[in-house]
Regions:
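OB-fold and OB-like single-stranded nucleic-acid-recognition modules
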Residues: 1-105
Length: 105
C-alpha cells in the first residue's frame, strides 16, 4: 500500500476533458484490461469513469503496479490527459485517457 498524502486530486474522473493537462484523479478500479504491453484501467468516482493508460513508455515499476490492480482497488493516479485513438461515445470522458506517470494503490 502506498502513501497518498502528497498527491491531491485536481479533478474528478468525470471532469477529465482537456488534452495536454496534467491531472491527479482518484477513485475505485472499475475494470482492468491487460493486453500484455498495454494496460487500461477504468477508474470511477462519484462523477463518472476515466480510462488510465499504461504502455511501453510507462516506468516499469508503475506498469507492474498497474498490472497487479484488481476491481475495487482504491487508486490515485497522476498523468497527462491525451486524446484516445478510439473514442467511447458511451462515456462522458470517452474521448480522453490519462497517460499515468505516478500511481498509488
Amino acid at each position: 500500500m502506498d502513501l497518498m498524502q502528497d498527491l491531491r486530486r485536481t479533478c474528478y474522473c468525470g471532469e477529465v476533458t482537456k488534452a495536454g493537462e496534467t491531472v491527479v484523479v482518484g477513485g475505485f478500479v472499475q475494470k482492468v484490461r491487460n493486453l500484455g504491453n498495454l494496460i487500461f484501467i477504468d477508474l470511477r468516482d462519484r462523477t463518472g469513469i476515466v480510462q488510465l493508460a499504461f504502455n511501453d513508455q510507462t516506468d516499469r515499476a508503475i506498469f507492474e503496479k498497474a498490472a497487479s490492480c484488481h476491481s475495487e482497488y482504491v487508486l490515485m493516479a497522476k498523468g497527462v490527459v491525451a486524446e484516445r485513438s478510439s473514442v467511447n461515445k458511451e462515456m462522458k470522458t470517452g474521448a480522453f485517457e490519462v497517460l499515468v506517470d505516478d500511481l498509488r494503490v
